[in-house]
C-alpha cells in the first residue's frame, strides 16, 4: 500500500555531500513526486523537501540512506491513509 510522505532534509555541509545525495535521490526517482532545494547564500546549509509516494519500507529505506550522509538531518511525515493509485 502506498503512502504520501514529505521527507525533510537539512544538509549541513552541502558542498561535501550534494553529489552523493543527488545520486541517492536519482536511484529513487520512481517514487519522487516533487523536490525543492533551498541553499543558503553562504553555502553552509541546504534545505531540501522531498515529496514521495511509496510503500513504507521504500520510504524508510530511502530516508535511512540519506540519513547516513555526514551532516544530514532527516525527518519524515507520512500520511496515515493509503493512496489510491488506480
Question: Where in the sequence are the language-model features?
Answer:
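Long, contiguous binding/interaction regions
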Residues: 1-86
Amino acid at each position: 500500500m502506498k503512502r504520501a510522505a514529505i521527507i525533510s532534509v537539512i544538509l549541513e555541509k552541502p558542498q561535501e555531500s550534494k553529489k552523493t545525495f543527488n545520486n541517492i535521490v536519482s536511484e529513487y526517482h520512481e517514487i519522487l513526486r516533487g523536490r525543492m532545494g533551498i541553499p543558503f547564500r553562504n553555502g553552509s546549509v541546504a534545505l531540501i523537501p522531498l515529496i514521495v509516494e511509496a510503500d513504507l519500507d521504500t520510504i524508510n529505506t530511502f530516508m535511512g540512506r540519506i540519513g547516513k550522509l555526514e551532516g544530514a538531518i532527516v525527518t519524515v511525515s507520512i500520511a496515515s491513509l493509503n493512496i489510491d493509485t488506480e
